[in-house]
């Protein structure tokens, strides 16, 4: 199990559970700061992050209908290899959204981050722990 400290958001001054996550697609890799969001249904990948990984928007065909603040935003489902710290890489499914990272951050939600990892939040201590699922 790996322990993380909340990161203070510059705009709001509020602690947020952020992790550095390495994403891989083929030979291309990218490390993103992702919000571990137990209230999010899906993992979200901003447009520019997908483009950096070599994804081509026009080649996608698995349409995702989004709700909430992303309702009406065009999105496609993509599967990427992801690695958190020293843990073994796993496959995560993302809704790749047509919004840049300046408008939406990478989110790790119920499908399927919380199916691959056990997450424990200790909000009063501004700490959270993550461990790969037991096999």
Give the location of each predicted region.
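Pepsin/retropepsin-fold aspartyl endopeptidases
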Residues: 1-135
């Amino acid at each position: 199990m790996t322990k993380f400290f909340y990161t203070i958001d510059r705009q709001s001054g509020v602690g947020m559970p952020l992790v550095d996550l390495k994403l891989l697609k083929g030979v291309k890799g990218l490390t993103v700061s992702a919000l571990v969001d137990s209230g999010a249904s899906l993992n979200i990948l901003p447009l520019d992050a997908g483009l950096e990984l070599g994804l081509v928007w026009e080649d996608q065909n698995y349409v995702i209908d989004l709700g909430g603040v992303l309702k009406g935003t065009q999105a496609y489902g993509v599967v990427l290899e992801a690695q958190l710290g020293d843990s073994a890489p796993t496959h995560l499914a993302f809704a790749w959204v047509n919004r840049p990272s300046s408008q939406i951050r990478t989110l790790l939600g119920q499908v399927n981050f919380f199916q691959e990892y056990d997450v424990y939040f200790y909000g009063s201590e501004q700490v959270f722990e993550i461990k790969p699922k037991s096999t």
